[in-house]
UniProtKB/Swiss-Prot annotation:
This is Probable heat shock protein ssa1. The modification N-acetylserine is found at residue 2. The gene is ssa1. GO terms for molecular function: ATP binding; ATP hydrolysis activity; ATP-dependent protein folding chaperone; heat shock protein binding; protein folding chaperone; unfolded protein binding. SUPFAM superfamilies: Actin-like ATPase domain (SSF53067), Heat shock protein 70kD (HSP70), C-terminal subdomain (SSF100934), Heat shock protein 70kD (HSP70), peptide-binding domain (SSF100920). PROSITE patterns: HSP70_1 (PS00297), HSP70_2 (PS00329), HSP70_3 (PS01036). It is found in: Cytoplasm. Residues 610-644 are annotated as: Disordered. Belongs to the heat shock protein 70 family. Keywords: Acetylation, ATP-binding, Cytoplasm, Nucleotide-binding, Stress response. It comes from Schizosaccharomyces pombe (strain 972 / ATCC 24843). Residues 613-635 have a biased composition (Gly residues). One of its GO terms (biological process) is protein refolding.
Amino acid sequence: MSKSIGIDLGTTYSCVGHFSNNRVEIIANDQGNRTTPSYVAFTDTERLIGDAAKNQVAMNPHNTIFDAKRLIGRRFNDPEVQSDMKHWPFKVIEKDGKPLIQVEFKGETKTFTPEEISSMVLLKMRESAEAFLGGKVTDAVVTVPAYFNDSQRQATKDAGLIAGLNVLRIINEPTAAAIAYGLDRSNQHETNVLIFDLGGGTFDVSLLTIEEGIFEVKATAGDTHLGGEDFDSRLVNHFAQEFKRKNKKDITGNARAVRRLRTACERAKRTLSSSAQASIEIDSLYEGIDFYTSITRARFEELCADLFRNTMEPVEKVLRDSKIDKSSVNEIVLVGGSTRIPRIQKLVSDFFNGKEPCKSINPDEAVAYGAAVQAAILVGDTSEKTQDLLLLDVAPLSLGIETAGGVMTPLIKRNTTIPTKKSEVFSTYADNQPGVLIQVFEGERARTKDCNLLGKFELSGIPPAPRGVPQIEVTFDVDANGILNVSALEKGTGKTQKITITNDKGRLSKEEIDRMVSEAEKYKAEDEAETSRIQAKNHLESYAYSLRNSLDDPNLKDKVDASDKEAIDKAVKETIEWLDHNTTAAKDEYEDKQKELEGVANPIMAKIYQAGGAPGGAPGGMPGGAPGGAPGGADNGPEVEEVD
């Protein structure tokens, strides 16, 4: 059975699962947590990913990157990117219209694309899975918000490539959650299920029908820029104003203070899901001033009222698009950590006339769970639970081309089941027109200027003819990942031209991806080297201390000559002092220093053990690194066998 995994690559947290023996195992990371912060930090000495990165964010706000998902596949001048940049302590710069993240790493200024940062998080998830499954893992299904557009999907796929994954498929988060909900419910009747997925940074609503293992998405809607982070930001602004009112000081220019406040706000927000009030206590927040305050659930709900209300629009849109009345929705499934907010639960319940949402699936893990099932199916798992499962997803946005006068002419309407293929015949609008420019857009507006340009290509060499005579067949083909291929055929000459909409403006080239893959491997090797360097340092330190402790042991004290004890004491003291002054030495230096110390200690320790030694040896065994017994034995004492 192949070791395939499903990864929920979240804005704020990520999660990974594996399906085998008819069940999904959500895999904990090296800290024992089942979700991992989507954070990457760069320091003077190393790169940290996940919990380790988030834990040091207040000390290193400018070089700790989060929210890469809010940048991926977007343009630098996107208004949402511009508004986010006001909240981020790290620096985002522009290159060729794309946003790049700039950090100080090991004393140098480095820039990374959002794809590279996301790939580091994916790599961390992959490593957790490899540790758990015991072996190499490459096959993965990665999830994206249902409302992600073409370039965001493509960029997520690239992030997987950079992390060394074979991305079997990109699937939509609410659809993955629906699998988690429906896998164990084998009712034969058609069930209409509404998935309400509100996470850290994105929001999706999908309506599916589930019947005999067939999961068919009827419609999807959402906002790729709404989630828990936005609620945190409202709290941060609220408390920053309160601090200013009380202390006449503005903390918003101080990245460290704002970060500490944001962490406290996130904690308070979580507390308010179960309590009516939460207190915030931050010592020495700014210029030595302590900040103690509290907030009630009602005040929090008021601060975020408009954001909470906005979550209802996509619900209405999905019901309209799928032509299903809200009374026909059989189950409401809440996914994403932000759905724990009581106000959100009440809004959803009230909208559906008091119907209670399903509480039986874990909102943090459902998406990774479904992705793991889909990954198993794609690598050929045939267990009884998965053999009849079929997933039919939809294109979230209409896809079309620009026709005369800047009109958006859709070929594939939104909520069309994918994979799908559609062709239409167009013609020229001027006499003897030698070529046509085919511009591909996505969006719902009537004019292309209000839609998103995905890419364009030229079909040239059309023989001279009056307008309207040449026949140009344009074909749109959307694959199972929701990624579009477009081709055009001039029927008279048989000339064809095609492009995969790899969003020429936003997409990484093959060369860039190859470069990033090799850099990712280089960073991984550096991380491993840093780990082994620290191990060598710890080894030396614990050896020095265990030597010192051995000499203080009452059983050994009497058997050591004063001069020998002094020699070891001196060597240990020198080693510990050297360690204090050389915290960033190379691995070899630590190993050489350990050999030096062993050179002093081993002959003395051997002498003690030959003279009869302590009963049962030194407590805790020989100090690490000392050979077990006299080197080669000696003539006057008993022969000592070396033991491991």
